[in-house]
């Protein structure tokens, strides 16, 4: 069989030898040094690129991990600064209150997930925080009473409207005597 180049001849030989290696158990492919000498320049270049690409992946993973660590530390620092700025103010906007509630929920869930606390001081602080939260929750009951008063005021407005309709001060849309059917009696329908 005639080949146009040594590279195509080598490629055909390697495919045949790989085929025999898969079929025949004792067949060996040959020396790697002989293959290196018979390879064309493009094949040598592609082999070098394949070999160098493996460490590049590891380097990329390391750099990505470093970048991720830096970004995480930056976001933590920004959150800490934002919290300190909000904490220093006496009056908070609606967005700031939402942010603080979100922080409280997140921190409460993290504390709840802790299984055991070794340090006694931390445990005492945690119990103090729990007690203060319970006190704050107890104060919210007064707000609910105010809400009940508001709903009763709304109900009184509806009652006033009903009284005015009964007295005839306000008319309610519906059938008027001029629009009722001529032969219609209420006693007939019952």
From Swiss-Prot:
Keyword tags: Nucleus, Transcription, Transcription regulation
Domain of life: Eukaryota
Compartment annotation: Nucleus, Nucleolus
UniProt cross-references to Pfam families, sorted A to Z: RRT14 (PF17075)
Chief location: nucleus
GO cellular component term, pick one: nucleolus
Entry's family note: Belongs to the RRT14 family.
Record's function text: Involved in ribosome biogenesis, probably through modulation of rDNA transcription.
Official protein name in the record: Regulator of rDNA transcription 14
Organism this protein belongs to: Scheffersomyces stipitis (strain ATCC 58785 / CBS 6054 / NBRC 10063 / NRRL Y-11545)
Lineage of origin: Eukaryota, Fungi, Dikarya, Ascomycota, Saccharomycotina
